[in-house]
Amino acid sequence: MEKILVMNPGSTSTKIAVYQDETPLFVESIEHSQDELKPFENIIDQYEMRKDLILATMEKNGVHKEDLTAIVSRGGLLPPIKAGAYRVNEDMVWQLTYAPQNEHASNLGAVIANAIATELDIPAYIYDAVTVDELEPLAKVTGLPEMQRKGMGHNLNMRAAAMKYAKEHNKPYSDISVIVAHLGGG
């Protein structure tokens, strides 16, 4: 049986869950107050604090890190990529730590996942990074020839909501057109 740690670091919380196969063992949102985050000059500086809180929350819920078989996190602000899953590697961690496209809490996901996974010798993945860019060429038009719109957004949440809708209506995801709004803290 697989035990997978799932993480979603956001601006005001870190949502985590551990699944045994497809069954959630626990789901928890670790809230971060402004006072708690204030000492950190850059978001990446929150790495140790958030990693420690994730591990402590797992222990509190009776899950030992040694029992994990994989880790999956929300993807951060990488260069533009296609939607889907990517195995975390050192180049990705370097990009998110030292040269992210922008400062964002999602950048912590792959960094934390990689640290825990490396220690345990298990795989770490990201899924649907913020910088998923699958826009049609026309959607990139801004009105200024020298500027193109970039495909960026809360792709993880939006694609999951659209996939859920498709499943509930017994339609292939590729055959639906839906409008999804993300209303979050970031």
Predicted features, each with a name:
Residues E2-M7, L68-V72, D175-H182:
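Short glycine-aspartate micro-motif
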Residues G10-K15, G76-P79, H182-G186:
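Gly/Ser/Thr-rich loops at beta-strand to alpha-helix junctions
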Residues M58-A105, A129-G143:
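Short beta-strand-loop/turn "lid" adjacent to the catalytic site in phosphate-handling enzymes
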